[in-house]
Amino acid sequence: MKNLLSILLIINYHFAFSQEKKYPQDYFAPPMDIPLYLSGNFGEIRTNHFHAGIDIKTQGVEGIPIKSAAEGFVSRIKISPYGYGKAIYVVHPNGYTTVYGHIQKFSETIEKYIKAAQYKKESFSIELFPMSSELQVKKG
């Protein structure tokens, strides 16, 4: 019985700690060329939910250009009067996805892509899922 219990504990220990995932240390670059000060942290308690990202202060300036934290492709674009407002999702080769929300303006290429879809749908609110070859982005 002791041997069986020991074996079960070892197996349980293996499965519990083999789930630990190493995240890349120097893979991602800052998304803006300003000092990064946070106004909202991941997981902080909001009125009816936990905050699902980090909010970066923009020194009171609107329209600061946002850069992709790493190379990848735009996998989702969502424009809504709620939530993130204008948001873009970038999938990176390492399997991570970065989300950029509360965006004032997209790049010219992405703006044209969105506007064409909005006119086609005849709606400001839109959710798009571009193919991986359509909107490639580079780090920075």
Set out the residue ranges of the language-model regions.
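A cross-family detector of function-defining hotspots
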Residues: Y100
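Bacterial Sec-dependent N-terminal signal peptides
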Residues: M1-P24
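Surface-exposed, glycine-biased beta-strand/turn segments
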Residues: S18-A87, V91-Y96, Q104-T109, A117, ...
